[in-house]
Swiss-Prot record:
Lineage: Bacteria, Bacillati, Actinomycetota, Actinomycetes, Mycobacteriales
Reaction(s) catalysed (UniProt annotation): tRNA(n+1) + phosphate = tRNA(n) + a ribonucleoside 5'-diphosphate
Record gene name: rph
PROSITE patterns listed in its UniProt record: RIBONUCLEASE_PH
Domain of life: Bacteria
Organism: Mycolicibacterium vanbaalenii (strain DSM 7251 / JCM 13017 / BCRC 16820 / KCTC 9966 / NRRL B-24157 / PYR-1)
Keyword tRNA-binding: yes
Name this protein carries in UniProt: Ribonuclease PH
Function summary: Phosphorolytic 3'-5' exoribonuclease that plays an important role in tRNA 3'-end maturation. Removes nucleotide residues following the 3'-CCA terminus of tRNAs; can also add nucleotides to the ends of RNA molecules by using nucleoside diphosphates as substrates, but this may not be physiologically important. Probably plays a role in initiation of 16S rRNA degradation (leading to ribosome degradation) during starvation.
UniProt GO MF annotations: 3'-5'-RNA exonuclease activity; tRNA binding; tRNA nucleotidyltransferase activity
Length: 260
């Protein structure tokens, strides 16, 4: 089999690194790297829930995604300066939130909110899938922090791990984890979010250049699930290390929260 432009096999991920404790203030903070794509993912805890959630006894998890102006080859203006959030940004923010809510028991949080922030420092394809993969680890650290503070009714509210990967058809070949040079010319482009129990959370797929048969879809899903299995191993290895910071004592006011 001929190799890709970057030397990888079709089913091979780019080098993936997950660094916990990347910043000190949030309960969970991760730098995730998929090759040259780098995303900072944080998980912050705040008391209270959205108005429509009040009185339910359940918590909430929300997510925001953004790209730094110089994350790509050409600088893009900050959306905060433009005065409105773009459609792509809203779509990815909602995707990250949906993906992580699939793995957590919100009732265990009480009426508290975990806010996930994913900021793309450098983009080379697959930013949304990198964000989801890194954000899960940040969420796991935030849960560890809340459990240590005695804030959870269930100390183990995470039912599974969540990871995501891009997969596409490029030059007629199914390839995983597409960098920008491949993503920009893919005939079929897909993002797959999965759990470590073998189930799917979300599939986003498009025939960019042409239609594609069901058999291709099945092969793409097989390739994506195999790649996610590798990502789960990387997540587990990262989370085997001790919590990257000082955990609170039960009953002690949580310091890693908004406004602290």
């Amino acid at each position: 089999m001929s190799r890709r432009e970057d030397g990888r096999l079709d089913d091979e991920l780019r080098p993936v690194t997950i660094t916990r404790g990347f910043t000190t203030h949030p309960a969970g903070s991760v730098l995730v790297e998929f090759g040259q794509t780098r995303v900072m993912c944080t998980a912050s805890v705040t008391e209270g829930v959205p108005r429509w959630r009040k009185g339910s006894g359940q918590g909430w998890l929300t997510a925001e995604y953004a790209m730094l102006p110089a994350a790509t080859h050409e600088r893009s203006g900050r959306e905060s300066v433009k005065g409105r959030v773009g459609g792509r940004t809203q779509e990815i923010s909602r995707l990250v939130g949906r993906s992580l809510r699939a793995c957590i028991d919100l009732a265990a949080l009480g009426e508290n909110t975990i806010a996930i922030d994913c900021d793309v420092l450098q983009a080379d394809g697959g930013t949304r899938t990198a964000a989801i993969t890194g954000a899960y680890v940040a969420l796991a650290d935030a849960v560890t922090y809340l459990a240590a503070a005695g804030k959870l009714s269930d100390p183990r509210p995470l039912s599974c791990a969540i990871a995501a990967v891009s997969v596409g058809v490029v030059d007629g070949r199914i390839r995983v984890d597409l960098p920008y040079t491949e993503d920009s010319r893919a005939e079929v482009d897909m993002n797959v979010v999965a759990t470590d129990t073998g189930t799917l959370v979300e599939i986003q797929g498009t025939g960019e250049g042409a239609t594609f048969p069901r058999s291709t879809l099945d092969k793409m899903l097989d390739a994506a699930m195999a790649a996610c299995d590798q990502l789960f191993e990387i997540q587990r290895a990262a989370l085997e290390l001790p919590y990257p910071g000082v955990l609170p004592e039960p009953g002690e006011p949580a310091k890693k929260a908004f406004g602290s």
